[in-house]
C-alpha cells in the first residue's frame, strides 16, 4: 500500500491550492486505475458521475470528475473523507490521480431517497427502521461535529446523500463535496432547498446547527414517507422563500410527544434553540428501546406477498394523518386534519396502552432533556404542565408491549397524535393554541397536506439578517448560476458581480411573477364570483320588475272593480228609490 499526497501530481497540485490549509497533507492510498473494472453508472454525487466497479475482488463505487469546475468539490470530499472513520460514514478506500477519481465503499441498498420515493415496487419498512435510520444519521453527524482539531459540518444532509447497506438496516452518510470545516467562513451556499436551514441561504454565517435542521426534516420524511414541501413545487427559491417566512412541514397526527418535540426543536428559526447532535443521539438512543426490529432486512412486496400481506407498496391499507399547522401568538390556530397515505408504516395491532405513572422500570420511564446540554439519564420525572421533559406515560402508548410468553411483540407507529405547537412554545401545554379538527370521510386523497407558515415569537435569526436572501440565486438552474470567477482578474470579478446582481434581479422578477400569477388566479376567482353575483342580481331585478308589473296590473284591476262596484250600488239605490 502506498501513501500519496494531494500535491504529488500536476492535477492534485492545482487542486491542492483550493484547500484552505496548504500545509495539510491528505493521506490516502493511491490506487492504480488499471486495477479498477468499471461495471455500470449508478448515478451522480456532489460532483461527477458515480459508477459501480470491481477492485481487488470487491464491489466499490468510484466518483470521477467530469470538468475542472468539479475539481474543488472533489478535493473537499477527498480531504474530508481522509479524515473520518465511522461506521455510519461511507468508507474511502483510496483515490486515483490519473484519471482523478475516488474509490469508495459501495452501498448495494442504494440511497434512502430511492427507498422512500423511488420506483415501484417500494420496500416495506417499519417505524423501527425509520427511527434507526435517523439515529444512525445523527450518530454519523455527531461524529463529524465532534472532530478535532476542526469539526466538520456536512451542509447537504438529505436522503439522496444517505446510503443503505446490509439489507437496508445500516445507514451511511456520503457526498462530502459540500462539507467544510466549522471554523471556515462560508461564502458559498450549497445544498438542497427542501432540507436547507434558513440561515444557510440567508447569508454566510451559519454553524453546525444547519445539519440539525436538515436532520429534523429527514425525521419527518421517513415517518411520513412524503417529500418535504412537495406541494409547493416550482423552482427551489419558492421553497426557500416559504422556509424563510416560517413554513415548516405539517405536524403528524398521534406522533409521540418526545419525537414531535425533538423534531420541532430542530426546525427552530433560531439555531441556538435547536438541540445539538449529541443531545439528539441521546434522545434517539433512548427512544429506540420502544422500536424493536430495526435489524431485520427490508422486505419488498414480492418477498412477503405469500405471507398474506399486501402485494403493492402503494396499498392504502394503513394511514398516517398529517395535521398542518400555522401557529401564531396573536391568534388561535386552526388546524386541518388531512389524511395522508403511508405505504410502509402499518397500524398497530391494537390500541397502544397508556403507561402507568408509577412504572419505574427501565423500559417504562423516559425523560427528555428540556435544555440542550442536559443529560437524559439525570432528568427528574415530569410534571403535568411540561412537554419538553416528558416520560413515556405522556406518549399514551406502550410501544414495546409484551405477549403472554414474555417476548416483545412487534409494533410500529399507529395513528400519531398531534398538537399545534410552536418550537418556541413546546415547554408548556397551556401555550398550545385552540384546535379545530375537520374529519374527512371516504377514500383518502393522495395529495400531500399543505404546509403553513410557522411564525415564532422572534422572526429574526441570531445573525440579525433581514428579509433579503442575498445568496439564494445559488439554487437557480445550473445554466442560470453565475460561473466562478478568476480571483486574479478584475474583469472576471466584475463580470461575476454583474451576473450575481442580474441573477438576483431575475429571482426577484420570478418571485413577483409567481405572486402576480397567484393574485391573478385570486382575481379570476373573484371575477367568476362577481359574474355569478351579477347574474343573480339581474335575475332578482327581473323578478322584482315582474312583481311590480303584476302589482300595477292588480292595482288597475282593483280600481276597475271598485268603480264597477260603485256603479252597481248606485243603480241599486235608484231602483229602490223608484220602487
From Swiss-Prot:
The record describes its membrane topology as: Peripheral membrane protein
Classification via CDD domains: STKc_TAK1
Q: Which residues carry this modification: Phosphothreonine?
A: 184, 187
Its EC number is 2.7.11.25
Query: Major place of localization?
Result: cytoplasm
Q: Which GO terms describe its biological process?
A: apoptotic process; I-kappaB phosphorylation; immune response; JNK cascade; positive regulation of canonical NF-kappaB signal transduction; positive regulation of JUN kinase activity
Q: Does the keyword Ribosomal protein apply?
A: no
Question: For the region Interaction with MAPK8IP1, what residue ranges are annotated?
Answer: 1-300
Q: Where is the composition biased (Polar residues)?
A: 306-322, 416-425
SMART domains according to UniProt: S_TKc
Cite the post-translational modification comment: Association with TAB1/MAP3K7IP1 promotes autophosphorylation at Ser-192 and subsequent activation. Association with TAB2/MAP3K7IP2, itself associated with free unanchored Lys-63 polyubiquitin chain, promotes autophosphorylation and subsequent activation of MAP3K7. Dephosphorylation at Ser-192 by PPM1B/PP2CB and at Thr-187 by PP2A and PPP6C leads to inactivation. 'Lys-48'-linked polyubiquitination at Lys-72 is induced by TNFalpha, and leads to proteasomal degradation. Undergoes 'Lys-48'-linked polyubiquitination catalyzed by ITCH. 'Lys-63'-linked polyubiquitination at Lys-158 by TRIM8 does not lead to proteasomal degradation but contributes to autophosphorylation and activation. Deubiquitinated by CYLD, a protease that selectively cleaves 'Lys-63'-linked ubiquitin chains. Deubiquitinated by USP19; leading to negative regulation of TNF-alpha- and IL-1beta-triggered NF-kappa-B activation.
One MF term from GO for this chain?
Answer: MAP kinase kinase kinase activity
Q: Which parts of the sequence carry Phosphoserine?
A: 192, 367, 389, 412, 428
This protein's source sits in the domain of life called Eukaryota
Cofactor requirements of the protein: Mg(2+)
| Keywords of the record | Apoptosis, ATP-binding, Cell membrane, Cytoplasm, Isopeptide bond, Kinase, Magnesium, Membrane, Metal-binding, Nucleotide-binding, Phosphoprotein, Serine/threonine-protein kinase, Stress response, Transcription, Transcription regulation, Transferase, Ubl conjugation
| Residues at the catalytic site | 156 (proton acceptor)
Q: Which residues form the Protein kinase domain?
A: 36-291
Question: Can you list the disulfide-bonded cysteine pairs?
Answer: none
Q: How is its activity regulated?
A: Activated by pro-inflammatory cytokines and in response to physical and chemical stresses, including osmotic stress, oxidative stress, arsenic and ultraviolet light irradiation. Activated by 'Lys-63'-linked polyubiquitination and by autophosphorylation. Association with TAB1/MAP3K7IP1 and TAB2/MAP3K7IP2 promotes activation through autophosphorylation, whereas PPM1B/PP2CB, PP2A and PPP6C dephosphorylation leads to inactivation. Ceramides are also able to activate MAP3K7/TAK1.
Q: What does UniProt give as GO cellular component?
A: cytoplasm; plasma membrane
Q: Which family does it belong to?
A: Belongs to the protein kinase superfamily. STE Ser/Thr protein kinase family. MAP kinase kinase kinase subfamily.
Under which name does UniProt file this protein?
Mitogen-activated protein kinase kinase kinase 7
